[in-house]
């Protein structure tokens, strides 16, 4: 039985991996075996960090809301408690945006929260 070298299918598969490894340092963008390992690891990082990104942004929003709340004489938890008691359902992303770009509106929300803390 003659030896089969793989031909076009193998070449296409390897070219696909090398294309994904474009921009990698050293031999990781030219040698198939090393590039394949790095591409697999990169895809794992991408999968993990798509989930991590959501946690990171939530932490950032909470930090920004806390800083703005303290400028208005409240802690983050008391602000959120007051807003919940007042029936104001604004998500953290929008609150953080208000804290950064519209301080007057955030101050109004803070006063409403202060008035609704038990």
From Swiss-Prot:
CDD domains: Ribosomal_L20. Keywords: Ribonucleoprotein, Ribosomal protein, RNA-binding, rRNA-binding. It comes from the Bacteria. Pfam families: Ribosomal_L20. PROSITE patterns: RIBOSOMAL_L20 (PS00937). GO terms for biological process: ribosomal large subunit assembly; translation. One of its GO terms (cellular component) is ribonucleoprotein complex. InterPro entries: Ribosomal_bL20, RIBOSOMAL_L20_CS, Ribosomal_protein_bL20_C. GO terms for molecular function: rRNA binding; structural constituent of ribosome. The keyword rRNA-binding applies. Binds directly to 23S ribosomal RNA and is necessary for the in vitro assembly process of the 50S ribosomal subunit. It is not involved in the protein synthesizing functions of that subunit. Belongs to the bacterial ribosomal protein bL20 family. This is Large ribosomal subunit protein bL20. It comes from Bacillus anthracis. The gene is rplT.
